Regions:
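Extended, charged catalytic domains and RNA/DNA-binding interfaces, predominantly
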Residues: 1-255
Length: 255
């Protein structure tokens, strides 16, 4: 049937698609950050089509337990994780559901896990009643997420591997990690030489975690941006967003 109408492959067309803009990785004061959570949702609703306001949830391999100089740093992080588990997560899920309005403004449940070995990741959930899944590592997290509608996405990938930068040896190609976060207020992880250098407080960029390094290894993935800002203002100017081409602003179409 080659050359006939019946034999033509039907390709997706942009003629019936629209651009929708969101921020799927940003923070407020529900864990460590600034700005009220409701104000964050209101800010998102005023300028975005969809959002996930992201609590920090865990750091399984947090270092420094044997160094008394770092106790205040550990307490700062673990104290926030404790608050999230003592009612904070339920409040967060409830407010996410409150702001989710099909066809008007979509809200997604997500949360972040830090990792020295694997790099920091965000779990973005399709389900509005998604539980907070405990893990012993990012790889454990990915195993537990199998069979569920969850995207597990690495970010600020260009920091040094072993110090919360990305480790491409652990990349899982497929539906679980269909894209990676290349740009945020941390800077640009396309390479270690380009524009938008990384923030000084977590170190300079390193080639081994960058997008170009992953592509040279033959990895297949999409690219997204997020603000990763910590002041309760999703979609803040210049910090990164994600654009989606979809037929309509519904959960299924955006996902």
């Amino acid at each position: 049937q080659r050359g006939t109408a019946a034999g033509k492959k039907i390709m997706p067309s942009a003629s019936n698609l629209k651009y929708f803009w969101g921020d799927l990785h940003n923070h407020c004061n529900i864990t460590y950050g600034h700005g009220d959570m409701r104000s964050a949702f209101e800010a998102a609703k005023g300028q975005l089509d969809f959002v996930s306001v992201t609590p920090h949830a865990m750091w399984p391999d947090i270092p420094g337990a044997d160094d008394p100089r770092l106790k205040w740093v550990i307490d700062y992080h673990t104290g926030a994780f404790k608050r999230l588990r003592e009612g904070g997560y339920e409040k967060y899920v409830a407010m996410t559901n409150e702001y989710n309005k099909e066809g008007e403004f979509l809200a997604f449940v997500g949360y972040e896990a830090h990792s020295m070995e694997h790099g920091d990741h965000v779990a973005l959930n399709y389900d509005l009643d998604a539980p907070l899944v405990e893990c012993t590592s990012i790889e454990d997290w990915k195993q537990k997420a199998r069979g569920h509608k969850v995207f597990i996405t690495p970010h600020h990938m260009g920091y040094q591997t072993g110090y919360r930068g990305y480790n491409w040896n652990f990349f899982t190609e497929g539906d679980q990690t269909p894209f990676v976060e290349m740009y945020s207020r941390h800077g640009l992880a396309e390479s270690d030489q380009g524009d938008y250098n990384y923030l000084h407080d977590m170190g300079p960029r390193q080639w081994e975690g960058t997008i170009q390094c992953g592509l040279e290894q033959g990895k297949k993935f999409g690219i997204m941006g997020s603000t990763d800002q910590h002041a309760g203002y999703p979609g803040s100017y210049g910090d990164g967003r994600i654009g989606v081409l979809a037929e309509s602003l519904t959960r299924d179409k955006i996902w």
